[in-house]
Amino acid sequence: MTTHQESVDVLAIGAHPDDVELGCGGLLAKLSSEGKRIAILDLTRGELSTRGTPNERHAESEHAAAILGLCARENAGLPDGGLSNTPEQRLAVIPFIRRFRPKVVLTLMTPDRHPDHEAAHYLGRDACF
């Protein structure tokens, strides 16, 4: 997916490809249909998943981006199974937020039984300063 040149209305941050779609895909589709500029930041490639290889998940995420009408979708390349709200990982997320300049940031809900989902929530929240 090509990246954008302007700020976005909404940046949705998920731990793995498909997290954002499962959590708020309907909302993003609605906002996109209303002309809002929407972007997704996947923090990992989902490389530890038992539901497809990283390449398959990437292809699925590109297909989902087209369906949702996203203006951009990026991947931070952080380790699947190793997300943590550390200064180092926040520093990996901050450049995306600065580049997208979103009006609204959506993250995963907390509490969550998956530690990467919980960490994604706090990383997204704390990287917005």
Sequence positions of predicted segments:
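Active-site adenylate/phosphate-handling loop in enzymes that bind or generate adenylated species
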Residues: 96-129
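Active-site rim/loop-helix segments in enzyme catalytic domains that contact anionic ligands
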Residues: 1-100
